[in-house]
Design a protein with these regions (language model features):
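P-loop (Walker A) phosphate-binding loop of NTP-binding proteins
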Residues: 11
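Walker A/P-loop
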Residues: 17
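Post-Walker A helix-loop "phosphate-sensing" segment adjacent to the P-loop in P-loop NTPases
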Residues: 25-33
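ATP-dependent small-molecule kinase phosphotransfer cores
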Residues: 36-92
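Conserved phosphate-donor/acceptor-positioning beta-strand/loop module used by diverse small-molecule
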Residues: 85-89, 102-125
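Small-molecule kinase domains that catalyze NTP-dependent phosphoryl transfer to phosphate-bearing small molecules
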Residues: 128-192
């Protein structure tokens, strides 16, 4: 694509990672892999570039930055110029909108999912990663509580959002991905 960078924002369990992966696979879009000081959760984990605190401190030209659970995450300007999509949280969006001075037009896509759908996805995901049912419930409820404050402006429709896409359990993933791609295509043709 090329003229825009699409910032993908959504609460935990909203499906933002799955949707982004589908946009990459089906339409050939490229996604930024954040630099992070977090350790990989499992061998072969993708979606991030895992580096030490010392390596992170040497990064320059950051255009997005956030911290979560004691770990730092960022993207640098060169990554934006070479990619189409970036999964990012609200703090990262705020940083990006102030720091990014490149040629691409930023567009914010908010993936909205109801609480029940998000909860069921998070519990299921935690259980498949080895947590007991009780641990999965507790970690999911903690994330939901954290998201309620972190994403408040997005949930209430008070944040600057260019496009909202609903992704609930009764929605077909393929239809959602196609709708988002249609939006992306229309933005790219507007910016040319």
């Amino acid at each position: 694509m090329g003229n825009c960078i699409f910032l993908i924002v959504g609460c935990s369990g909203s499906g933002k990672t799955t949707i982004t992966e589908q946009l990459e696979q089906k339409y050939g879009l490229k996604s930024i892999q954040s630099y992070t000081t977090r350790k990989p959760r499992y061998d072969g984990e993708t979606g991030h570039i895992f580096i030490s605190d010392e390596e992170f401190d040497k990064l320059t030209d950051m255009v997005a930055y956030t911290e979560f659970a004691g770990n730092r995450y960022c993207a640098i300007a060169e990554q934006v110029e070479n990619n189409d999509l970036y999964i990012i949280d609200p703090k990262g969006v705020d940083f990006f909108m102030k720091a990014y001075k490149g040629s691409k037009t930023p567009k914010i896509i908010f993936i909205s999912s109801n609480l029940t759908t998000r909860y069921e996805r998070m519990v299921g995901r935690a259980e498949t990663k080895g947590k007991s049912h009780q641990e999965a419930i507790e970690s999911s409820l903690t994330r939901i509580a954290n998201d309620a404050s972190e994403f408040y402006d997005y949930i209430q429709g008070q944040a600057w959002i260019d496009y909202v896409c609903k992704n609930n359990s009764n929605d077909k993933l393929e239809d959602i991905v196609d709708k988002i791609f249609d939006y992306i295509s229309s933005c790219e043709s507007e910016v040319r």
